Amino acid sequence: MIELLSDRAALERISADDITSLTDRATAATFYAGALTPEQVEANRKVVRIAAETALGACANEHQLFTAAFVDGRFAGYVISTVHAADDRELDWLMVDPEFHGSDVSGALMRAGMEWLGLDRPMWLNVIQHNERAIRFYQKHGFEVDHDAVIEKIVPHFIMRRAPGSEVL
């Protein structure tokens, strides 16, 4: 059974080190492709270094929601959702421990983040271009790659957008 807890309730069960460790495992499984430059590898490592601070900051920010998933009491993943402006809503971080890939942890976190952002509002996310599994997952939740959007990242990313009321497969 998946248990979802948000903000302070989640932080009562996990530490900053737990967030960092889970992010390290999640990125190791999904962020790396064979041809990354040293700068790209370092950019991916930075994600791990800033994960706990970012999550703790989200818990203290009324425009963000940190939601953690637990399976049988074990920390399995998290999502950070951010409202930048009324129609600028971002599914900011979605990290799932590789041990729980293929379970509904990612789906439960995705639904929680999207519901908090408002299914009747447009939303977006960014995804590493070579992470085809994640792209397919986001497409199942109504997101489509915006090929006109440009994002300046060391590791190439796509912006994916979801129109209000888009169907979930």
Language model regions located:
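Short glycine/proline-enriched coil/turn segments at helix->beta-strand junctions
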Residues: 115-123
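Active-site phosphate/pyrophosphate-handling residues
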Residues: 108, 136
